[in-house]
Amino acid sequence: MKITDINVKTFRYESQIVRDDEGHTHPDPDLKEHKVKTTLFSIHTDEGISGYSFGVGKEITENVIAPILIGEDPFYREKLWQKLNHMQRIGQESLNDKVLSNVDLALWDTIGKILKQPINRILGLYRDKVPAYASTMCGDEMNGGLSTPEEYAKFAEWCIKERGYQAFKLHTWYPPIKWAPDPKMDIKACAAVREAVGDDIPLMLDPHHNYSRLDALWIGKELEKLNFHWMEEPMDESSMSSYIWLSD
């Protein structure tokens, strides 16, 4: 089996949310519908089986991805990933980790369809269910949204008591909100949620990689006091030295 073609289709649709340059989703403050777009990335084989994912651009596909994948066996997924990763390392800045991941997903989708098996079975089963947690959008400045710590607390309480979730994760405020990020404001929201849901509910915080080392350290210590389960990506995810520093 060989990969014979790679395609990217662009879809435009109406939405009431906006997405910033780093891919974060925000509610539109005016709640007005506007046109947004996304892409459907597809891998096609000589046996008529195709795999799909989202979010890969047309230019990077035509210039870099297609020349590497076309003619290859999709089962050589690891080899293809290593080739793309090498292209990233030698200066293909638009071939970022998100693009690599989406290409990898399409390859896995292709393999699963060939074998007629779900990917979790191909990778090796361990459990047949996983716990789910409720997760917010980012903070906003909208009435009735997530503009205050109290609104986070109210939403968390609703998710736990009314919807049956057994854990909760906050995404707090960040640009384009002018005053964000603000570590103290984030901790106020975390404290309000903890008070609302009680001591036994696992809580998590995702500060959107917006913080410095010292801010991340301070937030981490405050979250320890609130018995939070984890803090996700407080600093630039590509700065391994920052995470080594924080862990030490």
Task: Label the model's feature ranges.
Residues 129-245:
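Metal-dependent enolase-superfamily TIM-barrel catalytic cores that perform enediolate-based chemistry
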Residues 1-47, 63:
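Structured beta-strand/loop patches that form or line metal/cofactor-binding pockets in enzymes
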